[in-house]
Amino acid sequence: MNTSKTTTLIEKLVFDNKIHVVLNTGDRLTLPYDYTERIKKADKAQLQNYRLIGGGRGIHFPDIDEDISLNGILRYKTSHDLLAS
């Protein structure tokens, strides 16, 4: 039995009507384009120019000088999912 802990990391982003954060576990987190003011104002090309930082613990968008973290995304999702119930 494998008892090692797997660290959840961001694998990639997929863009359509929302931003899909694909994790190495196979899970997806969905963010609206108004997640931050800079992301809201960015065009698709600026958002598609991203790189993973911190070994997959965050995302850097150099064209809009924005960094977001997996921890921040999880906090956002938790609070917004609770508000929706």
Region locations from a protein language model:
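Motif-centric detector for short Cys/His coordination patterns
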Residues: M1-S85
